[in-house]
A protein has these predicted regions:
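N-terminal secretory signal peptides that target proteins for export/translocation
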Residues: 1-7
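N-terminal maturation segment of proteins
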Residues: 25-589
Length: 589
C-alpha cells in the first residue's frame, strides 16, 4: 500500500508541476507586456508625435518639447527602463516567444541609448524639425480612425504649437550639413503650400473650416519667416560633417542589423553579390540586344563591352515610360494586376480588408525617394495606409524630368509596386499589425521589412509575373543591383573620403542609374547612415532562409505556407527567423 501511495503521489506531483510551468510562464509573459505598456505610456507622454505615428491618439493635441532639457529627459527614461527591465521581468521564467520579445525590447533600448549618446540629430539634421511641422498635422488627417471632427480639433491644437518647434529649431541647429539643410529648405516650401492650401483638401468638408483657416494662417506666416532663416542665416553656415566615420558606422550598423554580422562582412557580401548580378544582367541584355538593335552587331564581350551592352539595352527599355501626371494612375493599375496574380498563383493570402490607398506624395515629403509605404499604425490598424508615389519635383527642368521618368519606366514601375505594395511592404505590414505581440507590433526590424520587400521582387518574376518578359527581368536585376550598391555606397561614403563625383561615377557607370536618380541616392546616403544597408542584408537573410527551409522540406515545401510562416512572427530581427518559421511550419494548417 505504501509503495502504491508513493507512486501515485509522484504522478500527481509531476502533473501539477507540468501544469504549473505554463501558468508561471503566462504570468511572466503578462508581466513583460505590462512593463512594456508602462514604458510606452511614459514614452508617449514625452513623445506625442511618436504616439501618433504608432496609432495611440491620447496625445494627438500635443507636440514634443524639443529643448535640450526635454531631450535629456528622453535619454533618462531610456536608461531607467533599461536598468529596471531585468529586475522587473525574469527572462528565464518567460515562454520562448516572450523571451524573444524581451530581447527585442532590451536591444531597442540599448540602440536608442547609444544613438542619443553618440549622435546629435537635433543640432545637426535640419530635416528633423520638418517632421514635427508637417507630420504632426498631416498624419491626423490621413492615418487616424478617430472622427474627423476630433482629428481637425487636434490639428488646430497642434498648429498652435508649431511656432515653438520653429523656435527650437532656430535655437538648436548649429552648423548642420549643407545637404540636410537644402532638403529641409525644399520640404519647408512644401509645408508652406500645405498650410496655405493642401490642409483644407485633406480635411475635407468640415464645420470647423473657419477655425482651421484661422489656425493655418499664422503657421504659414511663421514658416515663411523660418524659410528666410533657413536660406539666409543657416544655409551660408551649413558646413557640418555628414560622414559618420568608420567606428561609429560599424557600431550603428551592428545595432541596426542585430544579426551578428560586422560592417566589413556585410560590405564584402555585397561586393561579391554585385559581381554576380552584373554577370546575370549581361546574360539577359545579350538576349535582348536584337529586339532593340536589329542588324547591329553585339559589342565585344570584354568587361567594357559587357557594361556597354547592358547600358544600351537598359537605355532602350527606359524609353517605354508614362508622362509625369500619369505616375499615380499607373501605379494604381499595377496594384490591381499584382493582387490578381498573387491570388491566382497562391503566393500568399492577401490580408482583408485592404487598408492601402495609392496617393501622390505630398510635396513636403519629397526629396529622398520615389515612393514609400505608410502602413496603418500598429496601434490603430483600422486606419488608412498610403502607398505614395512622387512625380518629378516642380523645380526640375525638362531634361531632368525625362531622366527621372526613364529611370522609373513602365518595367521599373512594376518592380517598384511589387516592393512597396504587393506582396512587399503593404502586405507585410498588414500581417504585422495582426500579430498578437504588442512588442513586435511596435518595435519593428527595418532589416526584416526591407529584406522582405527586396526578396519579393525576384520571387514574383520567378513565379511567372510578367510572363517571362526579359525586359522586366533585366529591370528587376537593375533594381536589385541598386539594393546591393546601396550597401557599398553606404559603407564607402561614411567610412572613407569618397567624393560625390566618385559616387556618381559608381552609380551611373557600374549601376546603370540615371544622373537624376544617382544624385538623389547620394543625397540619401549622406542623410541616412546605415539605413541603405538594410535592403541587401535583409534580402540575403530572407533568401538564405528560403533556401534552407526548401531544402529541408523537399517536395513538401509549399510556397504559400512558407511565405505566411515568414510573415506570421512579425518584423522580428532576422536572426530569429529560422527558429520561428520552423516552429510555424511544424504546426498543422
Amino acid at each position: 500500500m505504501r509503495t502504491t501511495f508513493t507512486f501515485r503521489s509522484c504522478v500527481v506531483l509531476l502533473v501539477l508541476l507540468a501544469n504549473a510551468a505554463p501558468v508561471a510562464a503566462q504570468q511572466a509573459d503578462a508581466k513583460l507586456e505590462a512593463v512594456f505598456k508602462s514604458y510606452l505610456d511614459d514614452y508617449f507622454r514625452l513623445r506625442p508625435l511618436e504616439a501618433t505615428r504608432l496609432g495611440d491618439h491620447r496625445f494627438d493635441s500635443q507636440l514634443e518639447e524639443l529643448t535640450p532639457e526635454a531631450r535629456v529627459k528622453w535619454l533618462e527614461h531610456t536608461r531607467k527602463t533599461l536598468t529596471a527591465l531585468p529586475k522587473e521581468v525574469s527572462y528565464q521564467g518567460l515562454s520562448r516567444p516572450a523571451q524573444i520579445d524581451f530581447e527585442i525590447f532590451e536591444h531597442t533600448l540599448k540602440a536608442d541609448q547609444w544613438l542619443a549618446e553618440n549622435t546629435r540629430p537635433y543640432q545637426e539634421d535640419t530635416r528633423i524639425y520638418n517632421g514635427y511641422i508637417n507630420d504632426g498635422v498631416y498624419l491626423l488627417l490621413t492615418q487616424s480612425s478617430l472622427p474627423r471632427e476630433t482629428n481637425v480639433a487636434n490639428c488646430i491644437a497642434r498648429m498652435a504649437q508649431i511656432p515653438k518647434v520653429v523656435a527650437a529649431a532656430r535655437q538648436n541647429l548649429r552648423s548642420p550639413p549643407r545637404t540636410h539643410t537644402e532638403t529641409a529648405i525644399r520640404q519647408n516650401r512644401g509645408a508652406i503650400a500645405f498650410y496655405e492650401q493642401g490642409i483644407f483638401e485633406f480635411a475635407g468638408k468640415t464645420r470647423q473650416l473657419a477655425a482651421l483657416k484661422a489656425a493655418a494662417e499664422p503657421v504659414a506666416a511663421c514658416l515663411k519667416e523660418y524659410q528666410a532663416f533657413l536660406e539666409k542665416e543657416l544655409l551660408p553656415h551649413a558646413n557640418g560633417e555628414w560622414r559618420l566615420g568608420e567606428e561609429k558606422f560599424a557600431k550603428k550598423l551592428d545595432l541596426e542589423l542585430n544579426a551578428g554580422m560586422t560592417a566589413d562582412q556585410v560590405v564584402a557580401d555585397a561586393e561579391a553579390e554585385f559581381a554576380r548580378v552584373e554577370r546575370d544582367m549581361y546574360v539577359i541584355a545579350r538576349q535582348l540586344w536584337s529586339r532593340y538593335f536589329a542588324r547591329q552587331p553585339l559589342p565585344p564581350d570584354d568587361t567594357d563591352g559587357q557594361r556597354w551592352t547592358v547600358q544600351q539595352v537598359l537605355g532602350a527599355v527606359a524609353k517605354e515610360h508614362c508622362r509625369p501626371e500619369e505616375l499615380t494612375r499607373e501605379m494604381k493599375q499595377r496594384v490591381a494586376q499584382l493582387k490578381k496574380f498573387i491570388a491566382a498563383n497562391d503566393i500568399l493570402r492577401l490580408p482583408e480588408p485592404d487598408h492601402c490607398q495609392v496617393v501622390e506624395m505630398p510635396e513636403f515629403k519629397r526629396g529622398n525617394s520615389t515612393a514609400y509605404m505608410e502602413a496603418p499604425p500598429p496601434l490603430d490598424p483600422n486606419a488608412t495606409g498610403q502607398l505614395a508615389v512622387s512625380p518629378p519635383p516642380r523645380d526640375w527642368d525638362a531634361q531632368r524630368v525625362n531622366s527621372y521618368l526613364e529611370e522609373y519606366n513602365n518595367h521599373m514601375l512594376d518592380i517598384l509596386t511589387i516592393h512597396e505594395g504587393y506582396p512587399g511592404h503593404s502586405v507585410q505590414l498588414e500581417y504585422m499589425n495582426r500579430n498578437p505581440s504588442l512588442i513586435r507590433r511596435v518595435l519593428q526590424s527595418g532589416v526584416y521589412i526591407e529584406g522582405w520587400a527586396v526578396y519579393t521582387e525576384q520571387m514574383m518574376l520567378d513565379q511567372g509575373y510578367g510572363q517571362g518578359d526579359l525586359a522586366l527581368r533585366l529591370s528587376q536585376l537593375k533594381f536589385y543591383l541598386r539594393a546591393v550598391a546601396n550597401t557599398i555606397l553606404d559603407h564607402k561614403m561614411h567610412c572613407s573620403n569618397l567624393t560625390d563625383d566618385e559616387a556618381l561615377e559608381f552609380l551611373m557607370r557600374r549601376c546603370f542609374q540615371s544622373e537624376g536618380e544617382a544624385r538623389l541616392k547620394i543625397i540619401r546616403a549622406k542623410q541616412s547612415s546605415c539605413q541603405l544597408s538594410t535592403y541587401f542584408a535583409g534580402r540575403m537573410a530572407h533568401y538564405r532562409l528560403r533556401q534552407q527551409i526548401q531544402r529541408e522540406l523537399g517536395e513538401k515545401f509549399e510556397l504559400r505556407r512558407f511565405h505566411e510562416a515568414v510573415l506570421a512572427p512579425g518584423a522580428v530581427p532576422v536572426k530569429y527567423l529560422l527558429e520561428l518559421v520552423r516552429a510555424k511550419l511544424e504546426k498543422p494548417q
